[in-house]
Amino acid sequence: MTTIVSVRRNGKVVIAGDGQVSLGNTVMKGNARKVRRLYNNKVLAGFAGGTADAFTLFERFERKLEMHQGHLLKSAVELAKDWRTDRALRKLEAILAVADETGSLIITGNGDVVQPENDLIAIGSGGNFAQAAATALLENTDLGAREIAEKSLNIAGDICVFTNHNHTIEELETK
């Protein structure tokens, strides 16, 4: 799988992810790009789960963003509705972390849209490790969002065999 982490702090929001693609217990690729900018670079999105499934969801989510003029929550809810009702989409195995200047959301394969507590998202096989690390850093340091995301991904990469140290990091200014 992978690890994706999103941190919002001090006027910045970051989504970061590692680059490992695994097939069973074999590393197939180490430099995949699982974090992207969408909708005229105004929305960040990262995925954990099946790569082909995630690209399908990225495309559909970007279409929803265009339909709803970049409104993050409305686009996420509409994608989740499709995910629940479309027979082909229901079989997709992926989870998305998305953020814009105003908010962050998790969109699950069950069609759920969740606004995280404390503006922290950590998903994927190393998500629990990254979340624990990021929580500790948020509560006990003055580090910025980017540094917290990097450090928590490094810790997840040290522990989780499905997470590596080849990171993609995207950042936006927040309101």
From Swiss-Prot:
One annotated GO biological process: proteolysis involved in protein catabolic process
InterPro entries tied to this protein: ATP-dep_Prtase_HsIV_su, Ntn_hydrolases_N, Proteasome_sua/b, Proteasome_suB-type
Record flagged with keyword rRNA-binding: no
Annotated control of activity: Allosterically activated by HslU binding.
Function: Protease subunit of a proteasome-like degradation complex believed to be a general protein degrading machinery.
Family: Belongs to the peptidase T1B family. HslV subfamily.
PANTHER family cross-referenced by the UniProt entry: ATP-DEPENDENT PROTEASE SUBUNIT HSLV (PTHR32194:SF0), METALLOPROTEASE TLDD (PTHR32194)
The protein, known as: ATP-dependent protease subunit HslV
Phylogenetic classification of the source organism: Bacteria, Pseudomonadati, Pseudomonadota, Gammaproteobacteria, Vibrionales
Gene: hslV
